[in-house]
Amino acid sequence: MNPFTPDTLRQLAQTHDTPLWVYDTDTIVARIRDLQAFDTIRFAQKANSNTHLLSLMGAHGVVVDAVSPGEIQRALAAGFTAAPNAQGASGIVFTADLIDAATLELVVAHGIPVNAGSIDMLHQLGQRNPGHPVWLRINPGFGHGHSNKTNTGGEHSKHGIWHTELPAALAAIASHGLKLVGLHMHIGSGVDYSHLQEVCPAMVDLVKTSGADVQAISAGGGLSIPY
C-alpha cells in the first residue's frame, strides 16, 4: 500500500512548506528485509547521503560505500564505523581510483578498508600504513550499462585495475603487507542484471588463476529503481 496519499502529501506540504522530500520508514525497512537474502547489503551513498536515512539503514544491518572524504564524514556522522558487522563486512568501504594525502590520512585514522582502483593507490596506502585492509577494483575488459555514461568497464573506462595487471596489484599488496579482503567489479549501472552472469564468473576465474586468498567478491552496479 502506498503511504503517500494525496491528502497526506498535501498535509505534509502545508506543515513543512515546499520543496519537500518525503521518505517512508516502513517502506525502506521492508526493502532492506527483501534484500537480506544477500550476505551483505552495501549502500552506495552517491544514491542518497541523507544522514537520517543512513542511520536508519545502519540500524537494520546495512553497510555503506563512500567515494569521497565528504561521504566518509557523513557515514561517520550517521554512526557507521569500519568495524565489521555480524557477516564480517566493514561498516564503511572507501572506493576510488586516486587518493590524496588528506583522504589517505582519513582512511588510516579510522581503519577504513580501501577499494583500490589503481596500483598507485596500493603503494601510497602501503607506504603510509602497512597491513591496511584493501579490496581490488578490477576492470575485467568488458562493460555494461543502459548508456555510455553508465558503462564503467572495458577499454574506454578510466575505472579499475586492468584485469591483466592483477599479478602486479597482488605483488604491490604483498610488498607492503596489505590485507586483501576481496575483488570488486563495477562495470556499469542499468536495468538489466544479465551482466552479473559475466561479472561473477570473471571474478571467480581471476581468483582461481591468481591464487589470491580472498574473503569475498563484490559485483557493483546496484539495483535499479523502477521509475
Question: Where are each of the predicted segments found?
Answer:
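Glycine-rich, aromatic-flanked loop segments that form ligand/cofactor-binding clefts
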Residues: 131-143
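Active-site loop/helix belt of alpha/beta enzymes
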Residues: 140-227
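A charged N-terminal "starter" segment
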Residues: 1-132, 171, 175-179, 209-213
